[in-house]
Structures are given as C-alpha cells and as structure tokens.
C-alpha cells in the first residue's frame, strides 16, 4: 500500500518530516506532493489547481505500477478538502483525514464572522457536501485543542460519512497532531483492517 500525503496550508514539506518518518515505520510507501506556490513551486494554489495536482499524483503512482485501490489518501488540514474531492471516485483503499474542516466558508466564518465570506471566498472546499459520496473506509483524526479548525468540524464530517468509519479525538493535541505511539498504532490498525 502507498500513502498519498496531501499536506496543509502552512509551512513546507520539511515541516511534515516528523509525520513522514513515523508513517515510514508502518512499512508503507509514502508520496508527499508540494502544492503550487509551496516550497518554491510556481503557480496559483486555488481549489481547482490543487484537485488537479492530486489527480496528477495519483496518475503518477498508477504509471509507476501502484493501483488506485492500493492508495491511501491522507489529507492534512487544507489537504483534507482535496482528499475528500478526489476520494469521491471510491477507487481508493481508504482515506485518512487529519484536522478536517467542513467547508472553507464555515472555517473562514470563525475568523471573520462579520464578513460575507460566502461571497468573498472563491475556493469553497465543501467537504460537508461531498463526504457522503465516499464509500471507502474513512479515518478522521482531530486534536481536541485545535484552535485553527475546531474539533467539532471533524466530528460533523464523521457523522455524515458512510461506514466503515472511525473517529479519533486526540485529547492533548491541537491542529498539528503529535504522532505519538498511540496515534501511530491507531493508524496502523486502521490501515491493516482495510
């Protein structure tokens, strides 16, 4: 199996090295891509382009002999919206969402409650509307102390998602999960099950 890691908005690929090192302990292949305009890449990181980047990564893996049904989509924060979008094909092995939001509009309303964000935001990432279309197994992980994307958003997606599904609320973590041994074991058990 191969994890396709779709990273979040802040930082760069190096900032995910501790997660990738932990995932490497599971004896899986891991491919992480850098979005347009991240880590020195050119281009505009809009919703359509990020979906396209992820689809190209899937095609690249397919061209290297990795079947789609052996790919685990792993979305982190911003990347969760991309994972939900392309996961609707239901061809993937499973999907893991770390610190997901219900939609970019609802997440933005938390920070800008008096602005008409629905009309100002071009990129919507409406996972709340799309996740019901996914039939593959889903693991949703969220830190209880997340002050960027509230944990209730992950719980809401879990409620809407089809079975099989699992929700992990990590009591001591915030937006970026610590990837301790307990969390790694939960991820391993989920991956081994499917």
Where are these regions (language model features)?
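Membrane-embedded segments
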Residues: 1-60, 69, 87
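Primarily recognizes the serine-hydrolase "nucleophile elbow" in alpha/beta-hydrolase
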Residues: 60-64, 68-112
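Mobile cap/lid helix-loop segments that gate and shape the active-site cleft of serine hydrolases
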Residues: 100-136
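Short beta-strand/loop motif that positions the catalytic acidic residue
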Residues: 133-135, 140-146
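Acidic catalytic loop of the alpha/beta-hydrolase fold
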Residues: 145-149, 175-177
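Catalytic histidine neighborhood in serine/cysteine hydrolases
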Residues: 155-176
């Amino acid at each position: 199996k191969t994890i396709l890691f779709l990273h979040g908005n802040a930082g760069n690929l190096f900032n995910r090295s501790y997660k990738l090192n932990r995932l490497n302990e599971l004896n899986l292949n891991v491919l992480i891509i850098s979005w347009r305009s991240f880590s020195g890449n050119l281009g505009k990181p809009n919703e359509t382009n990020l979906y396209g980047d992820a689809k190209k990564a899937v095609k690249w893996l397919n061209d290297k002999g990795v079947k789609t049904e052996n790919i685990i989509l792993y979305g982190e924060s911003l990347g969760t919206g991309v994972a939900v979008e392309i996961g609707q094909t239901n061809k993937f092995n499973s999907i893991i969402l770390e610190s997901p939001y219900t939609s970019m509009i609802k997440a933005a309303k938390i920070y800008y409650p008096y602005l008409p964000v629905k009309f100002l935001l071009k990129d919507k990432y409406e996972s709340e509307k799309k996740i019901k279309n996914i039939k593959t197994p889903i693991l949703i992980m969220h830190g209880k102390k997340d002050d960027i994307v509230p944990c209730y958003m992950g719980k809401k997606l879990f409620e809407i998602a089809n079975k099989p599904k699992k929700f992990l609320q990590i009591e001591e973590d915030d937006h970026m999960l610590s990837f301790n041994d307990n969390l790694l074991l939960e991820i391993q058990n989920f991956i081994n099950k499917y």
